[in-house]
Amino acid sequence: MTEGRIMADAGKRWDFWIDRGGTFTDVIGRAPDGALHPLKLLSENAEAYDDAAIEGIRQLLDAPDTAAIDPARIGTVRMGTTVATNGLLERKGDRTALLITRGFRDALRLGYQARPDIFAKEIILPEMLYERVIEVGERLHADGTVETALDPASLDTDLKALRSDGIDAVAIVLMHAWRNPDHEVALAEHVRAMGFGQVSVSHEVSPLIKLVGRGDTTVVDAYLSPILRRYVARVKDALGATAVGKAGPTLQFMMSSGGLTAAERFQGKDAILSGPAGGVVGMARTAGIAGFEKVIGFDMGGTSTDVAHFAGDYERALDTEVAGVRMRAPMMR
């Protein structure tokens, strides 16, 4: 199909903007004539439908329950979701193992040795998202040269034990991998070859110098990406969604930074504040239309409440802690 044909067909399609929360899902559909149609549904209503976002689109298109949604009637679908947020708050991510350089198995638990309450007599360590640690016999110098070579096969016994125990998500965090990723690349290939479905690699997820920040972010990504991937796949299949620029519906998701990304690129580390970030952007745009330059937003949902302010520029933080979990990824604040 030519680009001109795609543009012509786009004028005959519906566009949808969706905010999927833990309790309610809000859907706004823009009909081919430009009219806006709002709809609110319970996010979980297993007796009536499998997914609220898909059901909202189906209702606005007046599509029968017994037939598949016609993808030719849909242009774009843009969604903010708290699937990852609630997964983190409720600790409902996938079971995860950490593979880290030998001698550093407790590095992420120790963190930066910060004490939230300096006078507390009993220090309660945060709950870690990973449940198993495998120490990897390898080591790089700070300049990236090899001190101890990697032998991925030496980990096979431990990796098979993970598979046997039902752990399918792995976070790989090796010392100085930001400088030289060769060991992480080789180890990731070996782990994937053994059948692990989710392998998050620190030099790809968060290419930063500091081990703790890089490691924390990689663990979050491994923990949450599988539930996101399953949700995205379900929505894509129901809508017949395709990549941006291709014929067919385009599915995009709001990231924690306030930007949109293609469905196939939506990762756990970028999804923590997907829903709330969309609220901040919408608040700022709506206030601007009304003539306000400074505004405070109060976004109250069924699971969490987010407060934000806007004074002309979007504020973002790189180092963030959500539900007791540290990570380094750009997020609205």
Feature names for model-found ranges:
Residues 2-333:
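N-terminally biased helix-coil "hinge/interface" segments that flank
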